[in-house]
Structures are given as C-alpha cells and as structure tokens.
From Swiss-Prot:
Physiological role: Displays several functions associated with host defense: it promotes agglutination, bacterial capsular swelling, phagocytosis, and complement fixation through its calcium-dependent binding to phosphorylcholine.
UniProt domain Pentraxin (PTX): residue ranges: 2-32
Protein name: C-reactive protein
Keyword terms: Acute phase, Calcium, Secreted
Oligomer and partners: Homopentamer. Pentraxin (or pentaxin) have a discoid arrangement of 5 non-covalently bound subunits.
Post-translational modification: Glycosylated.
A Gene Ontology biological process term: acute-phase response
InterPro entries named among the record's database cross-references: Pentraxin-related
GO cellular component: extracellular region
Localization per record: Secreted
Native source organism of the sequence: Pleuronectes platessa
PROSITE patterns for the chain: PTX_2
Family of this protein: Belongs to the pentraxin family.
Keyword Flavoprotein: no
Amino acid sequence: VVIKTLVFQSESNNSFVELIPMKPLNLRAFXL
C-alpha cells in the first residue's frame, strides 16, 4: 500500500492530499 501511495503522490500531489487527508504529516515530509 505504501508503494501505491508513493506512486499516486508522484502522479498527482493534489489528488494524494485529498485521497489521504488523514496523514498530512507524511505529505508535508515528502514535499520538503
């Protein structure tokens, strides 16, 4: 699941945020 999430985020950062709003910390770490 982690890999799938990573790929999704890479394809659409915005979509990832909306898809997984429960883990905003992870997204911020990746953005950094």
